[in-house]
Each structure stands twice: as C-alpha cells, then as structure tokens.
C-alpha cells in the first residue's frame, strides 16, 4: 500500500532524532496514550514529529500556544508535506472585544469584533480536510477547544452533486441559500454563486483559488468542473463533488424553529425567577433583549450574539460539552502539543476566565442562563476527547511528567551544537559587566539577548545602553505580534545588536545569531526565574557556535542550581556524542525568513524586485492594524474582480499575485507569486 503521508526533505534524521522517531512510533503502536518528546532548543523537534507522522501514517492535529508559533509550525509542515492536506486553525478575529458588564460602574460593553476572511477560509479548509482526507495535518491554537458548529448539522447540510443526476434548477439555488451562499451575478467571490442560464458558478467558502461550475441540460447535471474564477479557465472536470456550508454555524430551519420554542420556555422560567427576587430592571432588560433576538432568528436565521443560544442550536443538554474541532477529528487521529508546558495550562485556564465573565451577564439580565453553555471545553472534557497524545517541550510541566508513559529525550543536535556554557556572576555590578560583554559580542558581529524582571527595567536598561552607544531595542507585552516579529527580524539582520525583554524571550525565538544570553537578577525566585523559565531562556543561545549564558545573582537559588545542573547534564551528553562520532559542531546559517514571508533572494532572476524594495513593501503592510489590512485586501480583491469582469485578465492576475504576496507576508501561508523561496540550510530544514 502506498504511503499517503509523503515527507519531502533533502536531509535525513541525525543526532538523537532517529532514536526519538523509533521510540515514539513504537509507543504509539503499543497503545501508549501519552508520550513526551523532551527536545532541547535546536534539536529539530518539528522534523522528528514530521518523520513520526510519516512512519505511523495517521492524521494529526498539532496544538501551539499562540498564533505566532502556530504560523511557524504551519509553514514548516507545509514544506515537509507539500503533497498532503496541511491546515491552519486559529481564531479568525483580528480584533475581539467580548460582551461584558461592569456592575461597579453600571457599564455594559457590547461585543465588537473584526473577522479575518483569509483565516476563516483556512479554518473551513482545515475541517474539510479532516472530514474528507486521510492525509490531513492541522496546526491549531487553543481556539480548537472553543465552540464550533455542530458536526452532524454541518454534514447534514452539505450538497452532493453527481454528473447524470436529475435535479431541480431552483432546488439547487434553494439549497445554496440554505448553506448561506449569496447570489451575486456581477462578481464571484468566496461564499457567493452566480447563475447564467443553465450554468451555475459557485465559489466555495473554503477554497482559495478554485470555483465550481455546474452545467445543466434540462433537469440533468451534464458537467461538473473546477475553474479559475479570474480567467474562467477550466482547471479539471470531475464526476462528483461536495459543497460545504459557508460557515460552521449553519443550522437547518427546523432546528431554528425548535430552538426558538426552547428559548421562549427558558425565558419564561428565568423571568419568573427575576420577578420573584424583585429584580425588575434585570427582568425587563432580559425580556426585551431576548424577544428581539427571537424575532431576528425567525426573520433572518441569525441574530447578533446567536452563539449565546448555541446549546439549543446544537441540541445539547444543560452543561453538556460544546462541539469543537476535536469532534471533527478522524478516529485514528494523533494529537501533538507543542511547547506543552505552556499549552496544557492554557487549555485549563480558558474555561474559568470565560465562565466568570458570563456569570455577570446572566446575573444582571443581559443573557439567559443557557449562555453559560457557550464556552470552551473544560479540561476534563478535553482529556476525554483527546486522542493519543505526544507532548513536545524542552521543559515538560507537571501534567506531562505525571501522565506520560514514556519520556523520549532528544538532547543531541544534528548540527553538533552543544548547550551554552553557563556562568554565575555577582548582581551588584551586573549592568557594567553586561556592557563589557556586549562590547565583545558586537565586535564579533554577534547578538545579545538580555532578560529583566519588569517593563520599567527593560525600558531603563535600554535607555542606559543607548547612552553608551549600544544599538539596542526592548521587547515586552505592550508590543503587538507583528511589530514583535519585525523587531526579531531586525535583530537577525544586524540593524541592532542587543534585545532587552522579559517573558517574551523564552519559547519560540529562533535566532542563530545570538551568542550571549544575560539573565539579570537571576536569584529573584518567581515565575520569571523558575527552573523551567531559566532553562528555556538559556536555550536561546544554543543555536550559536559560541553560545554562552550569564546568570547575574548574589546567590544560587534552587531554581538556578537545577537549571544549571540540567544544562550541564545535557552539555556533557552532547560533547560525549560529538567525541564518539567525531562530529565537529557547525553554526547555523539560517535565511532570515519567519512569519512575515516574502523577502526575495538577491539575484533570483530577471524581473524580480530588489530585496530592499520588497522588505519596505512587506514592512508597509505588516505595520498596518488588522482592520486596515483587511480593508486594503478587500479593496484589492474588488479591483481584481472588476478587471476580470472587463476581460482585463493581465491586470486581474497582477492583483491576484499581489494579494497572494501580502497574505504570504502577514500569514506565512502563501508563497510569493513572483519569487522563489530562499533555500534553507540543513539546520533550518531539520530544526
């Protein structure tokens, strides 16, 4: 039988990778429910997981702690599995202000959100991959445990078409309306359809570049094909196809009517409780808001905040778990949790924060009690749904340690690089000593990361270093994701030499140019100076041939001692492996390419833009706020469709390529249409 998962890479597993792949595969075959891959920074954990997926040939969901790391993993998995269905499932909100009420000031804050159309399309494509293909890999954030449309209702609404079937022309249009597709005979874009005689063109909501053409002859389907919505070129013909709803939250009409009846019953019960407690204002508010929602549902099929009635729409019992992405997983799926020491606690925290906010809304008459069931999964519910699981972390947390049947170490790097040497120095002269170390590193054209305890300290230290003519920037939580990526990229390019930060300098920073990590006030016990945090931070220097970590403190705390001991244990094992196998460590020469894609290789061919110009263009778009960026993309898409209508296909194609490039810069999902990607080194391919 031919393998359905086909890993594409020029490199073979090395270091500890072959043993890790073998042990993980054997553990899955033996039925181990939980395993942990304890892989140090730069050891190629993603490449190990990719090889394991190819070995076991099972669909996989990969959970990441945030959108940034999810985008990096998505990009890497697409490179490893170009012939398979690799999906991306994160929150589709560019901006989200949840509904809330502050009793102290009697302030009601309505829900406000901006939906990213591109990510919504990728979410739909991800669930479709799980439903249709056995070779699906989906990278998701903790958004995967939030309520999604009921899987059974979603599947019951799909429209199946087959060549030769007898159909009613009006019946197809009626079914498309039920799937929430809109008719638009002037321009065709995602989620719309147009009718020209006996030809029906449909642009599926989950499709990025292909539309569907249904050709009828009287009441019979004569032809089904996929075509380019810009040029009209037929791409390929098929004998059958399936059209999925425009949204995960589509609901049959009969279910809506049944839900309305149940909402009315709960409203009557809740009003009786409020009047009995003499809460007249709350009762009046609740009745007015709920009856308005009911009218909207009956007339339009939806209302603002319809998710608060999701328990009725998905026909669940009070307290029953909501449908989520995990309900869409195939029975033989695998779960990989990246940076599990961060992701697992997040999974437990989502429910508690959501519950506290909604209880206030219910208490003061803004929502019915059933709104409490519009929630993420509880941790126990997630545990019941989770398939065989592999935790991936350099510093596994207590949950992983307690539950894992096997802990597989991946300490030896394919490049032969070893963990940095760790040194403890007095805190009294830490700033002056740091300045001296920075001078040495910058003279060698190397970069420095410095971690402090507070935002104020980060800003003050940055100002002090600037006064001493050090090229320095700081990084903390007030800086948004896109600007954060730009700062890291500028550090790698050498636009500055020192980056000062707090907690943001731990997981997910891949900067081979950093040769020194300095941890100020390392002897201050706490979350930021715990054993796990220190090991993660020290690991930021592990990708450099001259990597070194300095911990400034007047005493060696328990956390410091354990972190230093663990780093030294790994370092000894790596050095012994290198000596036994006569490996000479080599530095990583990694192309400067991260979540903001689209920087072209110099001299990559005639007609390509210069690197500087492209960098400026990429920076221009990535600096835009999400709402402005979405608006700009919509403007370009409208212009593209207008050119296509006027048969100006060259201009339309140019705009299509421009849109693709922009999405590549921002979402790291699309390749640049006019420039090849840079070739990565061996270390980049396997790390």
From Swiss-Prot:
The record's Pfam families line, in alphabetical order, gives:
Helicase_C, ResIII, UVR, UvrB, UvrB_inter
According to UniProt, the name of this protein is UvrABC system protein B
Domain UVR, first and last residues per copy: 630-665
**Which residues does the UniProt record annotate as the domain Helicase C-terminal?**
430-596
User: Where are the disulfide bridges?
Assistant: none
The family classification in the record reads: Belongs to the UvrB family.
Summarizing the function annotation, the protein's role is: The UvrABC repair system catalyzes the recognition and processing of DNA lesions. A damage recognition complex composed of 2 UvrA and 2 UvrB subunits scans DNA for abnormalities. Upon binding of the UvrA(2)B(2) complex to a putative damaged site, the DNA wraps around one UvrB monomer. DNA wrap is dependent on ATP binding by UvrB and probably causes local melting of the DNA helix, facilitating insertion of UvrB beta-hairpin between the DNA strands. Then UvrB probes one DNA strand for the presence of a lesion.
Superkingdom, according to UniProt? Bacteria
A Gene Ontology cellular-component term: excinuclease repair complex
Give the gene that encodes this protein: uvrB
Subunit info here reads: Forms a heterotetramer with UvrA during the search for lesions. Interacts with UvrC in an incision complex.
Keywords from the named record = ATP-binding, Cytoplasm, DNA damage, DNA excision, DNA repair, Excision nuclease, Nucleotide-binding, SOS response
Domain Helicase ATP-binding spans what residues? 26-414
Give any single GO term for biological process.
SOS response
Q: Span of the secretion signal?
A: none
Q: Which GO terms describe its molecular function?
A: ATP binding; ATP hydrolysis activity; DNA binding; excinuclease ABC activity
The record's subcellular location field reads: Cytoplasm
User: Motif Beta-hairpin: which residue numbers?
Assistant: 92-115
Species assigned in the record: Nitrosococcus oceani (strain ATCC 19707 / BCRC 17464 / JCM 30415 / NCIMB 11848 / C-107)
Domain notes, please? The beta-hairpin motif is involved in DNA binding.
User: What's the chief localization of this chain?
Assistant: cytoplasm
Q: Where, if anywhere, are coiled coils annotated?
A: none
């Amino acid at each position: 039988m031919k393998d359905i998962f086909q890993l594409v890479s020029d490199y073979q597993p090395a270091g500890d990778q072959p043993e890790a792949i073998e042990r993980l595969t054997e553990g899955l075959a033996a039925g181990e429910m939980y395993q942990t891959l304890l892989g140090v920074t730069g050891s190629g954990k993603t490449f190990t997981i990719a090889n394991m997926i190819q070995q076991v040939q099972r669909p996989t969901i990969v959970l990441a702690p945030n959108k940034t790391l999810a985008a990096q993993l998505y990009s890497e998995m697409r490179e490893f599995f170009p012939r398979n269905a690799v999906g991306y499932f994160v929150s589709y909100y560019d901006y989200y202000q949840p509904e809330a009420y502050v009793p102290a000031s009697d302030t009601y804050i309505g829900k406000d959100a901006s939906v990213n159309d591109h990510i919504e399309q990728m979410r739909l494509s991800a669930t479709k991959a799980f439903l249709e293909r056995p070779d699906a890999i989906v990278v998701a954030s903790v958004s995967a445990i939030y309520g999604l449309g009921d899987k059974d209702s979603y599947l019951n609404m799909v429209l199946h078409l087959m060549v030769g079937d007898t159909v009613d022309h009006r019946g197809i249009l009626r079914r498309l309306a039920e799937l929430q597709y809109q008719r638009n005979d002037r321009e065709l874009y995602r989620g719309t359809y147009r009718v020209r005689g006996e030809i029906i063109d449909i642009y599926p909501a989950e499709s990025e570049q292909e539309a569907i053409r249904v050709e009828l002859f009287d009441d019979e389907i004569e032809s089904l094909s996929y075509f380019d919505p810009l040029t009209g070129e037929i791409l390929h013909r098929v004998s059958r196809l399936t059209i999925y709803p425009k949204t995960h939250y589509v609901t049959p009409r009969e279910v809506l009517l049944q839900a309305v009846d149940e909402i009315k019953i709960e409203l009557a019960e809740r009003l009786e409780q409020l009047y009995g407690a003499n809460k007249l204002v709350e009762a009046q508010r609740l009745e007015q808001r709920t009856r308005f929602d009911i009218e909207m549902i009956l007339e339009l099929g939806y209302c603002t905040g319809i998710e608060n009635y999701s328990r009725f729409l998905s026909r669940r019992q009070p307290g029953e778990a909501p449908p989520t992405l995990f309900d869409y997983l195939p029975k033989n799926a695998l779960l990989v949790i990246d940076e599990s020491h961060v992701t697992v606690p997040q999974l437990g925290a989502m429910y508690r924060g959501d519950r506290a906010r909604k209880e206030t809304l219910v208490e003061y008459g803004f929502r019915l009690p059933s709104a409490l069931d519009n929630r993420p999964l509880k941790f126990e519910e997630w545990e019941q749904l989770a398939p065989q699981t592999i935790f991936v972390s350099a510093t596994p947390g207590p949950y992983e340690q307690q539950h894992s049947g096997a802990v597989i170490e991946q300490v030896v790097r394919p490049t032969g690089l070893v963990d940095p040497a760790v040194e403890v120095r007095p805190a009294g002269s830490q700033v002056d000593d740091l300045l001296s170390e920075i001078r040495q590193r910058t003279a060698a054209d190397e970069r420095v990361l410095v971690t402090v305890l507070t935002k104020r300290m980060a800003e003050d230290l940055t100002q002090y270093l600037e006064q001493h003519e050090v090229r320095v920037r700081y990084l903390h939580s007030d800086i948004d994701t896109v600007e954060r990526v730009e700062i890291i990229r500028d550090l790698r390019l050498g636009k500055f030499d020192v980056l000062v930060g707090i907690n943001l300098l731990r997981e997910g920073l891949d900067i081979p140019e950093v040769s020194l990590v300095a941890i100020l006030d390392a002897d201050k016990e706490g979350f930021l100076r715990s054993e796990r945090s220190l090991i993660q931070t020290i690991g930021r220097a592990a990708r450099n041939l001259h990597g070194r970590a300095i911990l400034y403190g007047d005493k060696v705390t328990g956390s410091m001692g354990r972190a230093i001991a663990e780093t030294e244990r790994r370092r000894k094992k790596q050095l012994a492996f290198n000596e036994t196998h006569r490996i000479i460590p080599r530095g990583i020469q990694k192309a400067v390419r991260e979540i903001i894609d689209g920087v072209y290789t110099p001299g990559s061919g005639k007609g390509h833009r210069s690197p500087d110009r492209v960098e400026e263009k990429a920076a221009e778009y990535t600096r835009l706020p999400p709402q402005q960026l979405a608006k700009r993309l919509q403007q370009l898409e409208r212009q593209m469709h207008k050119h296509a209508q006027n048969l100006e296909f060259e201009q339309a194609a140019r705009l299509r390529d421009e849109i693709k490039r922009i999405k590549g810069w921002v979402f790291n999902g699309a390749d640049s249409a006019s420039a090849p990607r840079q070739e990565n080194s061996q270390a980049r391919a396997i790390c």
